Amino acid sequence: MRMGTNRRLANVKTRHETGLDYIMQSMNLNTPFGKKQLKELKPFFPGEEEELKKELDRVESMVSFVNGNSRTVEHIQELFMEVKDVSYTIARSENQTLAVVEIYEVKSLLLAMRKLLSITVKDGKNLVPEDYILEDTTELLDVLDPGKDRINTFYIYDEFSDKLKELRAEKRQCEIAIRKEQKAKREELKEKYGIMLTPKFDISVSKSSPDLEKISGIPELEAADQDYLSVTFQLKPTETVYEYTKRMENLNGELEEEEERVRKHLSLEISKYADVLTANCEKMGALDLAMAKAIYAISHDCVRPEIADEHVVEIEDGRNLQVEDILKSKGKKYCPVSISLKDGVTCITGANMGGKTISLKLSGQVPILTQYGFFVPAKKARVGLSNYIQMLIGDSQSVERGLSSFGSEMEELKEILDHGVDRSIILIDEIASGTNPVEGLALTRSLVDYLIKKPYISLITTHFETVTETEGVVNMQVKGLADADFNLLNREIQYANRRERINIISKYMDYRLCRVEKQGEVPKDALNIAKMLGISSEIIEGAKKYIK
């Protein structure tokens, strides 16, 4: 696991909006160690490309392992489900005497480690990368399991101490002697009074029974319990039973002391292996996390990203995993998107419903997943590491804070610009859409002028087409309905209700991006969509007059 850096790549909102949190929450981890490592996972930064490549090597190895060893993977996962976090117990063993249940937990962990080692190493050959191979802890297991039964139970066994064995043997003899004395007394009462005591050496008599007075008068019995229906009598202890019972009380005290001495010894033995156990737990967690990464990559058709030295994000047929999962649940297909970004400003233009925001999030999802050592949802991807990735989208709790959406947006923009550094990725969705169009356009153009001079990859979605006229700005447009068969679309939508119409239009939308080298005819997707959703022709035709 990657540790030791407190640098922040992205804030909480960006992690959420790019889908990083969603993906991490969707991963199936089974050990407390793996879950902890996922929660504490740190990203790789520029200058750490070689370390990241090694991490991706490990994930790639695990992908091959998972693909070729499905049954073994199931065994490991089943084993991991039974593993408990005993880190606190291991730490306690260094200065305190562990309870029996705590020693049992350590033994259970050792058995799991032994089984995992037998699964991951066959005939002297490692089936998983060396980083995940546990150190052998058989010596400690032998200490806790002197009989070498390798059963997942624990008891302070006689093998731990000769004195313990002797005390328990004497106690058993006392119990046998007491039992023998009680049985003899039971037979005596049977012959003398004609009554038969139970195997527990008692008898229950109804309060309405004529025998109650007779049995109450038997000197060898005493009342032990009663309710409104009956009275239970039990055998009085004889002098012999009393002596053996007294001896057993003394033996119990000696046994308690000896068992504590054994537990103290076992705790000390466990403490000697504290570092090894802790390291093995880390390896189990790392294997759990690597398997989860691999399984997620396989199930979601993710690929290993190529790590570039230069600051770029190149995505071929990329997919936003969260949106794709939603579409799959509805039986719909996701339209993959390709985009190539480098330092400078790129603007995505097009109508609403065109998927601009999804493409923006995808452009953040791929690099942030890469820097956390994940495979990415694309046919191919090439990523140069960033120092900072931030996304500005939505109104960020403006209602709770009493701010307008525009005011909140400006606060977020200030934070992003204040923290921007070399090799940053800045993702901005529809900036200044919450204010009047004249000022909104002016602010957007000025922001583009500012960002184009910075060593950032800046990607902005906008309705303001003229923003792309700035020299050096790359203009990407959503293809939308440009290639749609409107005759077919109109026939299909003619008798549909409102919800069905939106779904039908979405089906015909082409969400892929195309680069616009020269500003030509303004796209009319918004007018086409408005018309198909029932806006009057008079309004649509009137709107066309204002489009230049």
Predicted regions and their residues:
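Conserved amphipathic alpha-helical "coupling/scaffold" segments
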Residues: M1-K171, K283
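A general alpha-helix detector
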Residues: R58, D85-T89, H265-L266, E430, ...
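Glycine- and acidic
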Residues: N67-R71, H265-Y273, T346-G350, E430
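Active-site phosphate-binding and catalytic loops of NTP-dependent enzymes
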Residues: E94, L189, A292-V303, Y372-K379
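Extended, charged alpha-helical coiled-coil/arm scaffolds that mediate oligomerization and mechanical coupling
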Residues: E135-G194, Q226-D275, E282
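Charged, glycine/proline-rich intrinsically disordered loops and linkers
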Residues: E188-T232, T240, Y244-M248, A482-M509
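Amphipathic alpha-helical domain-onset/packing element
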Residues: A274-A308, E314-V323
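ATPase nucleotide-binding head domains, primarily ABC-like/P-loop NTPase cores
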Residues: H300-D301, A308-K548
